Structure formats: C-alpha cells, structure tokens
C-alpha cells in the first residue's frame, strides 16, 4: 500500500499550484456586445427603452399661432422627473397633426362667424428615438383674440412602457376626459366673460360715436358730409357689425349642449351651480335679456372703455396664457385632476393590473371580505348599496346575491352549528342593579393531549420550555340576545344623553367544581413536571358536557329583557321557510328595516349605569332610528386611498349614534380582581384613542408591510405569533418603548381577522391592567411595561391571564404561545422571501389571506358538513366528516385546521346576526399547552 509520503515523492513542487484558466478568445463575429444599460442597475424590471426620464409624467402643450408647438407645463412640476428629455421636440411630435381641425369663420349662407364644438381626439404615439410612448388627448379652447377664436391644446401622459399605455388606454381616456371637460367648461365661462366685456366696450364706443356724430351734424351748415363725418359713419357701422357678431358668438357659447356640462369630478356645489346656469341659458333666447339670467354674470363690476372700431375678423396678436383662458376655480380643479391621474397610474403595469383585478374581485366577494378587507373599500361598497333603490321594479326582479338568500329554519340558531373548537364551561355572574339577564349558550368540552404537541416541538427554537396548560380564547358565538318587538323593547328606547355618570358594576364568579379546579391548580408560569404530563390528559377528560347552563359563562348585562329562546322564536317566525340549495345561510330582507342606534345608559335610582344590549332592527314607524355612518375626515374628494376613520378608535362592541355620548366599554363585565394591587388602574386607558392616521392609505400599507417583513426576519418565532392572531388567540405585545410597540402592533394588524366592517380588534397601546373581557374585545394588544411600583398590578394581571393569551416580550425577546406545525404560515411569512418592498409584501399577504378566506367560505357554507345525514348520526361522525373535508379536500394539516375553523366561526357569527359587527363573540376556551420561545 502506498502511503501519502510516497505519493508526494513522485510529484513536483509546481504541480500544487493551479494554473490559471484562460478562456479561448471568440471571433469578433461571434462576440455579443455588452448590455448597454448595465451601469444603471440592470434587473428584470429595468426600462429597456433607454428613456431619458425616470418616471411617468403628464405634459400639456399648445400649438401657438405665434411660435408653433410649445410645452406649457408638466405634472409633477419638477425638472428632475423628465431629466434630459426634450420637451420641445416631443411637443412638436404630438402637435404635428391637427386632430381638432374644423371650419371656424363665415360658413356658406351665414353672415356671422360660427363656433364648432369639436369632440376631443385621443391617440397613442410613440417615439423610438426618445424611447417614449404617450397617450395624447387633444382639445380645443376658445380665445377671443386668437385666429378663428380657437387655441389647440393637448394633454399627454408620457411613459417608457408601451404596454402600459396600451393596456390602460380606456382608463387613461376616462380620466383625461374628466380633466378636459373641466378645463373646457372653465374656458367657456371665461370666454363668455370676455365677450360680455367686449360687448360693453363696443356699446360704450357706439354711444361715444353717436354723440360725436350728432355734434358734427349740428356743426355742419354746408349740407354735405365731410371726410371726418364719413369716417365716423363707417366706424360706427363697423361697431354695429362687431356688436352683432359678438352677440352671435355669445349666443353660441351659451347654447352649448346642456348634457355635456355634467362633470363627475365637480364638487356638489359646482355641479348644482352649473345646472342652474344651464337652466337659465335654456330659457333665455335674447342675448340682451340674458344679462341678468346668464351663468357668467357673477363677477365684479366692469368699467367699459373706448376701443378702436374693427371687425372681429381682425385679431390682436397678444395671446392669453392657459390660466387666463380658463376660470380660476376650474383651472385649479383641472390641475388637481391631472395630479390625481399621475398618482393613479404611478408604478409598473404589473402593479396596476394587480390592483385593478384585486378591486374587481373584492367587489365580487362581499361574503368573506369583512375578515381582512380594507375599510375604504367597505365604505365604498356600503355607499353604493345605499344608492341602490330599496324597492326595484316589479316587472324585473334583480338577482339575489348569496347573502340575501332566505334563512332555512333548520339553520336559524347558532346552536345548530357545533363549534369546531369546543369550550370549557365557566359561569360568571354580572350584577347590574336589581335585574339580571342570562344570554350565553353552553357547549361541550373536548379533551386535548399535550403529549402530541410535545413530540412535535420545534427543535430550532432555543430554550423552548413547556408551561402549564393554556386556555385559548376563541370568539365564536353571539354575545347579545335578540330582542323581540314588544312593549318592553319600546320602553328600552331612551333618548341619548351626553350627561351620564359612570360607575363600575360589581361582578363575582360562581366557581364550578370541574372547570375552575383545573384552572387554579397549575399556574401558567410553572414548568410541567414529568408526573403532570401523564395526568394532564386525565384532568382534561374529567370535563363533561353540560346539558343545561350549569357551569357555563353567563354575562348578565341586560335589564328586564326576555329569555333568549323565547326572543329568538318570536323574531324568527316571520322568516321565510324557503330553502335554497345553493346556500345554507343568509340574511333577512332589509327593505323595510333600519338599524336602531345603541341606546345610551339608563340612570337607576341607585345612580348606577345599566347597560342595554344593542337593539336589533325595528320597523321604521317605531320611535327613534338613526342610520349609522362612518365619518370621513380626509379633505381629499378624489383619492380614496387617503380616507381615514374618526380620530377615535371604533369600539367593535357597539357604535353609538353620536360622538358626544359617553362611551362605555365592556369593563363593567370584567373581573374585578384585576384591580387588586394596582393604584393606577383607571378607565382612562380604556377610552378609545386615536389610531394611526390614514388606516387604509398606501403609506400605511407600505409601512405595515415593511415592519412585518422586519419582524419576520428578526424573530425566528414569528410563525407561532402569526398563528395566534389567525386562530383568534389574543397576542399581547409587551414593551417599554411606546413607539416600537405601536409599530409592531400596526405591522401585525394585517394578520388580524375583523369582527365586522367597522374596525379591527386591535388596541395599539394600553398602560392599565388587563381584564378578562379585554381578550374578548381585542385580539392584538400593545401593553406598556414600566419599572415602577404602580405597574405591579399590570404585570400581575398579565401573569394571571397569560394562559388566555400569547405574550410577545420585546424587551427580553421571548414569546409564550401554543405550538404551530402547519404549512400555511410559512408560506405567508417566509423569512427567506425575496420581497423587499413593504407594499409588495402587503399585497402578498392579502393574496394569501384571500385564498384562506375562500377555504373558510367553502367549509362554512356546505350543508353536508354541519348537518347530520340522518337522525341516528352522532356528533362524532359529523366531526369526523368535517375533519376529513378539511384535510382531504382543502389540504390543511395540523394547526391550519384551527385557523380555518376560527374564520368559519366568524363567518357564522357575522351572518347569523341581523346587525353584524356590532357585538363581540363570546369567550371560548380550549386547553392547549404553551411553549416559551427565546432568541
């Protein structure tokens, strides 16, 4: 056998060094030139046309009769936008053909000039030399001093992407037509004003000439006309002819077709003013009589002057600017519309098409949109629905959408659905004065095996330790009873009063032996010993299903209300019994129904506050009723992306009809023991605070997406945190720095499902101790950590309710939450993603959540999954069929099933309520182990 030294002996020293590899030279005819734009940061999205401008812009040009084609202004008005792009040359290109050519002057058989109202021309031009493509919108403005009274202009949207111009031609045409109509309307107004001034000048000149002629006649004793008299007579004749011509022009400009004066972008006041003006024009035929009824008379008094008599065929070469040709108000509005167009079509074609398709698809999916939909789009759809007449024509019935299908009697009650996550039954009594109310249904309990989760513990996380059993908070059921139309209901309708004295209601717990014993024996901060792991399942199996309401949670929040079962039966008698096989759930017809505002609080003799549950729909003739609406504080009338909600956070539990009415949260129902040891526990932190400005703006989406990307890449346990949000488990973000906490809460809010279309269940910042009902209201909470004795109560309550929530500690970089082993969240939040832009990642999240909502919709509205096939089929068989459908048909595994089940529960709750989004789901608990993740 040859050893290594023997091998080395037969080698040379220079053989250890690798010789450099020299590629053979290619002939010149086979050589490929370098990419000419490699120095500009070549990537698949680089502009290959070599355009000299960095972004799209709008150019306004004119074909001047004095200097020819010339650029007037650009939008945005910044030289850095178009760079070295030759605006003069491109203006010559786009204005080389007169697309607005028409005869203006004395037509055959007419003694006076005639104005032709020419339609706009729309063309697409390309310049390969400049690497620019443009949508060009040609229009004609009128100028009294111009040749033929016309001034040709054009507005061009210039881009380096030819496909973008061609694909968006219809949208560009529609938007530029709005700007053109606004500009032309202002031009007609200014042109009519110039004609009026000219007529006043001519009338004054005629009066002066008449006076001078009479003086000359009196001074003439010879009996024949002098040369001066003849000159004055000719000048007077020219003035008379000019007056007739200008009056005819004024009549023509006033007779512009009324239907063309309707501009969608005008403000309501402007539109009404325009219509009134058009009405006056249509009823006025004599130009001299229309001086007081004309639409162009509201202007300062004009002092006439003496002008040189000449025909209107002679023109002054002093031309007006574009701003002078148009009324100031209309010109400003036109520039605003053009700025909106530039912002609207900003970005590449892929982004524009994706956004347009997204908007179209969201309008077609109103059933699941409330879960993750932007509030702006919801408001737009609600406004459109309000504009639809409530009673359509009888001869043609509109098609019924899915959500308007009649409710089958067999599916009326929420109890007919078995929850996908069974609950542990706890009973809580709430004392409010002398009257009590019970309105919560009892559900069964199911055991959970923690050993299965322990076996699948992710070994990549450092220091993962198991805590005590955890109770998952899952909102699934309705929390308020349905009040029937009765005398008692009418008595509850009290006038809204802003002067209400708030007092805390007293609450206590009635502890059941089964459920609370398990809750109190194992603190969440303790580690699970070995002997406890074996006894853990047996402790859970001791939970039995209650046949009645004994041992269940009861929140008694009503005063003198009827029983829930009787109320539901009374309200559901009028529901049609027709069953549609295409859908298994629906809503009542809302043609004659209006929402009643949540009543204020009734002052009792003991000076305490009695909370009345939110009223359902009542008949219009039944007392006070107010239609709810979401305020819009955004001054922009056009850009919907900048719309925002009021300056206070909307409480998902109830929306009062007035902001002046005192707001009452669900703190009255909270556990009073959380106040122990906290001197700083006040109600000030419970008052809804101002959310970040522009919740649905593009800037908010970009920042939220960017911060979410940072969170995913910085924290290796991001997947369990996101799973907690998607599955309905409240996530508490704990930290000292308010700015950091708010940023992270805003970023994680894109993963939080909504209860309704009014507000997300997110609390960005709170400093007082948490109550148990806060976990029902808020699914994402930012909690303050302060190193002071006053904050001991906050940490105490957080430790007490830690089994109800997932806790993300930003200071210690830890997360305590249940284990996640699914495949959905890794695709939703991949730390190795190549996405760099926050807005792009936001669209990615919306796309994934839309797919998730479609699965939840399919699971929710399938008859055979939730109803027994026959009377003898057990609930275990139904649950097995549901699980099989989720795994085999929808391709879900492990914890992904819990996410879809939670979304399905929200869908059921949303469509079983007559006024969705105004109440909270109930607290529902499930035993799951929590694990501590560390970095």
From Swiss-Prot:
Residues 842-908 form the dDENN FLCN/SMCR8-type domain. Keywords: Autophagy, Cell projection, Cytoplasm, Guanine-nucleotide releasing factor, Nucleus, Phosphoprotein, Synapse, Transcription, Transcription regulation. Widely expressed. Expressed in the forebrain and hippocampus (at protein level). The keyword NADP does not apply. The modification Phosphoserine is found at residues 416, 467, 470, 488, 491, 497, 788. InterPro entries: FLCN/SMCR8_DENN (IPR037521), Folliculin/SMCR8_longin (IPR037520). GO terms for cellular component: Atg1/ULK1 kinase complex; cell projection; chromatin; cytoplasm; guanyl-nucleotide exchange factor complex; nucleoplasm; postsynapse; presynapse. Residues 318-833 form the cDENN FLCN/SMCR8-type domain. PROSITE patterns: DENN_FLCN_SMCR8. Belongs to the SMCR8 family. Component of the C9orf72-SMCR8 complex, at least composed of C9orf72, SMCR8 and WDR41. The complex is formed of two protomers, each individually consisting of one molecule each of C9orf72, SMCR8 and WDR41. The protomers homodimerize via an interaction between C9orf72 (via C-terminus) and SMCR8 (via N-terminus). Within each protomer SMCR8 (via DENN domain) acts as a bridging protein between WDR41 (via C-terminus and N-terminus) and C9orf72 (via C-terminus). The C9orf72-SMCR8 complex associates with the ULK1/ATG1 kinase complex. Interacts with C9orf72; the interaction is direct. This is Guanine nucleotide exchange protein SMCR8. It comes from Mus musculus (Mouse). The gene is Smcr8.
